[in-house]
Design a protein with these regions (language model features):
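Short, solvent-exposed beta-strand-terminating loops
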Residues: 86-101, 169-181
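Metallo-beta-lactamase
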Residues: 33-35, 88-156, 160-231, ...
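Residue-level marker for buried hydrophobic side chains located in beta-strands
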Residues: 27-29, 58, 81, 172-174, ...
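Short, structured coil segments at secondary-structure junctions
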Residues: 3, 76-77, 215
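Active-site metal-binding motif and surrounding structural segment of the metallo-beta-lactamase
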Residues: 37-88
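C-terminal regulatory/interaction regions
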Residues: 232-236, 240-248
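Conserved beta-strand hairpin/beta-sheet module of binuclear metal-dependent hydrolase folds
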Residues: 1-47, 51, 165-180
């Protein structure tokens, strides 16, 4: 579905994949779940495109719910997959995911939200995500020579190699899991710090400063609906959401 001019989304907001189109060519941002593979082909067809029109797959980070179909499109269509160097080993499956000890207490968990995410994972192939055999790298501050010309903003915390992609031409920023507008564990909506799956919550909080001053009217998270009230307001709300025990 088109959510802004030149930007389309796969998924219903639980786990997001974005397609960024420019002059008939496409950049994919994140690869969601393996089960999105058929959805990807359908969305490209709706655009009048095929996998041959995809120039690159960019990962905001290398957690399994963002790696999804990456190896399949790399292997079958030769699409290069790019990730920050600090997440390259994770993308290749050489190391496992790490979680910070600070997360929402059990009282804030939502059985309904957890059940919904578990059902999604089971029905979209999340139990069999294939590591990426070969990845390229993208560096902080680089403007990438791919459709949309996204600029890389390193935001370590959720993972060491987490990044955002700022696309001034679309007045948009893709923030990955630097923050969410839908929490798959608690069910919370709106911009907030989703602490459960962060590698280092304090580092994630510090990284928010790297978003200050970026001009973007639309914010596109890895989980949840697009936020159309601007990045500045989104970051303000995220800071307001920080748990007291992480403010010291």
């Amino acid at each position: 579905m088109e959510i802004a001019p030149g930007i389309r989304r796969l998924g219903a907001g639980l786990v997001n994949v974005y397609l960024l189109e420019e002059s008939g060519a496409v950049t994919i941002i994140d690869a969601g779940a393996p089960g999105y593979w058929k959805d990807l082909h359908a969305e490209l067809a709706a655009m009048g495109r095929t996998p041959d029109d995809v120039r690159a797959l960019l990962l905001t980070h290398a957690h399994s719910d963002h790696v999804g179909f990456a190896e399949q499109i790399r292997r079958e269509s030769g699409v290069p997959v790019l990730v920050h160097p600090d997440d390259a080993a994770l993308a290749r499956g050489e190391v496992g995911q790490v979680r910070d000890e600070h997360g929402p207490g059990y009282r804030s968990w939502s059985i309904r939200a957890i059940a919904g995410f578990a059902f999604f994972a089971l029905t979209h192939g999340m139990t069999r995500v294939t590591p990426i055999a070969e990845v390229g790298t993208l560096l902080d501050g680089a403007t990438l020579d791919v459709p949309g010309a996204p600029r890389v903003v390193h935001l370590p915390g959720h993972t060491s190699g987490s990044v955002a992609f700022h696309v001034p031409a679309r007045d948009a920023v893709f923030v990955g899991d630097a923050f969410a507008t839908r929490n798959v564990i608690t069910g919370r909506r709106g911009p907030h710090l989703a602490t459960t799956f962060n590698e280092d919550n304090r580092r994630a909080i510090a990284s928010l400063a790297r978003l200050d001053g970026l001009a973007a009217g639309i914010v596109l998270p890895g989980h949840g609906d697009a936020w159309s009230k601007g990045l500045e307001e989104a970051v303000r709300l995220v800071r307001d959401s920080i748990p007291d025990e992480l403010r010291a």
